[in-house]
Regions:
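Short, Lys/Arg-enriched N-terminal segment that forms or immediately precedes the first helix
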Residues: 2-15
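Short amphipathic alpha helix immediately N-terminal
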Residues: 20-32
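Hydrophobic positions on the alpha-helical face of helix-turn-helix-like DNA-binding modules
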Residues: 26, 39-40, 50
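DNA-recognition helix of helix-turn-helix
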Residues: 46-64
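Helix-turn-helix/homeodomain-like alpha-helical modules used for DNA recognition
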Residues: 80-99
Length: 99
């Protein structure tokens, strides 16, 4: 099972591919640290439906990464950047992935 931090990183990359409701639910739970019950109350739904929605978002994020590999590619570029001795090239590589 992946860590919450991993899913937060994937969310930052792929949030544009999610519906507004999916984005809001995930954001409320992981960024605003609201409990599933609190989100359910706001959305006038059940805690179980919010749990299922968060689980579905995590599944979609995993699926997107499996197909598109943006995070994996970013990690590989950063790894290469760390092994490069040319300072200018290192900075260009880091800049290319927004770091």
């Amino acid at each position: 099972m992946e860590s919450d931090f991993y899913y937060i990183e994937l969310f930052e990359i792929y949030k544009g591919l999610l519906t507004e409701t999916q984005r809001e639910t995930f954001y409320s739970h992981y960024f605003l640290d609201l409990s599933l019950a609190e989100i359910a109350e706001q959305q006038k739904s059940s805690r179980q439906s919010v749990f299922d929605a968060v689980k579905k978002v995590k599944s979609k994020l995993t699926e997107y990464e499996k197909e598109l590999k943006i995070k994996a590619t970013e990690s590989e570029i950063l790894s290469i950047a760390e092994s490069v001795s040319d300072k200018a090239l290192k900075e260009r590589l880091k800049s290319a992935v927004g770091k």
